[in-house]
Amino acid sequence: MDIFNPDHDLCLANGSASFVPPATARQFGQDCSAIMEYVLPDVSPHKVWGWDRIVLGRLLKSGADPSQLPSEAYLDTVRELSHRRYALSCREYVFSKIGNPGFLCDIAPYEAMTMDSIISTVNEYADALLKAPWSGSGKGIRKVRPDSWTASDRGWCAKMLDRQGSVMVERRQKVALDFSLQFRMTADRLLFEGFAIFETQGCAYNANLLASNGHILGLLSAYSETKDILRVRDLVGEYLETAFLGRYRGVLGVDMFFSEEGLLAPCIEINVRNNMGMVSRLVYDRLASEYTGGFCTGASGASGASGASGAGASVCAGTSGRSGAGLSAGFPDGQLKMRVLNASSPEQLRSSLAGARTILAGGGPDALHAVAIF
C-alpha cells in the first residue's frame, strides 16, 4: 500500500496521533496519489510521502503487518530531525568549514524561546521571516518588520511558543533562484541523488524544472563558482552523515537559494521526507532514459562528487503509457517544468491543464489537484 500524504508537515507540527488533517490536504493526497510511482521505498515495503503517527495509523487500520512498519520510536526521531534547528545547525557547520565564506549569504537564523527575544531579533534584522519550528511547503511562515508588527503576528508567535516551544527568526533576503540538494540515506551511507531547481508562489511550492544534473549545475554556476557549489554540497553531506546516519532512512531534501546579490544561502530547510525536488529528479531521469536511447542521468551527472556525496543509483524504470503521453522523442533538457496545480472546481482544473504536455497525477473528473508537465 502506497500513501501520498502531503499533510505530513501538518501532522508533525501538531504532534498528536489523533490529529485530523484539513479536508483540502486529504483531497490533494487522494487526487494525486499516482505521484507515488516516482517515490522510492525506504524503511518499509509500503511507500509513503513522509512518516508520521497519522500515516502509521492509516496503515495499521488497513491491515498492514506491524513488523513491516517503522516503530513509534523511529517516528519520534523523524519528528525530531524535522525541526528547523537541524537546518540551523547544518548552516553553522557549512559556515564553520569554509574559511572565507564571501560567496555565502548569511540569513543568521536564530531560535527564539521568548516573545522578547523574537521582538529584539526582528528589531535587529529590520526585515525578517518568522518560521514555526515544524512546518513546511510554505506554511508557518510570516514576514515582519519592526514597524509592521500586528496583533495577529504577536498572537501567532505566542501560539508557536506555547505549542512548539520556539520561533525561528531569520533575515529576509530577496531570492533570485531557489534550488535544493537531493540525498538518500540508506542503512549505512548517504547518497547524493542530484540537484533540483524549484519555484514558489507566496512561499509555497509551485514547480520544478525538469533538467539533467549537468544542466542544473550550469544554471547554478551562473551565480557562483562550480567548485564553491560542490564544496557546499559536500559539507552538507558531511553534516547529514553525522546527524542522520543510523537514525533515518529515506529521502532528504535540503533547500537553498541564491540571493539577488548572487550569494548562496545554504541549508534553509531540511525536508526529512520525500519532496517534489526528488520527484522531479526521478521524473526527468526516467523520461530521459526512455526518450534518449537509454541514456540516464543520475548522481554521477554532477562532476566532482566524492565521499558522502558520491554517485547514487540512477532510477531508470520504464514509464507508464500515461506518463509518456504527448512527449516527443528526445526529452528536452531544462525546457519543461513539473507543476502542481490546485483549483476551486474540477472545471477550473481542467482549464489549467489545457496546455499540459502530460499529467503525472490527478486531473480526474472530480479532482481539484494535479501534477503535470508543461
PLM features per residue range, with description:
Residues L12, A25-S120, G136:
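Conserved N-proximal alpha/beta basic substrate-recognition cap immediately N-terminal to
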Residues C105-A108, V122-K143, M160-V175, V254, ...:
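ATP-grasp fold ATP-binding core
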Residues A126, A151-A207, F257-P266:
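Phosphate-binding site of ATP-dependent enzymes
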Residues D162-S166, A204-G262, G326-A354:
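A long amphipathic alpha-helix within ATP-dependent nucleotide-binding catalytic cores
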Residues F183-E238, N271-G293:
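ATP-dependent carboxylate/phosphate-activation module, predominantly the ATP-grasp catalytic core
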Residues Y248-G301, G324-M338:
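C-terminal structural cap/anchor segments
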Residues S289-G301, V315-F374:
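Peripheral (often C-terminal) accessory segments that flank ATP-dependent C-N-forming ligase machineries
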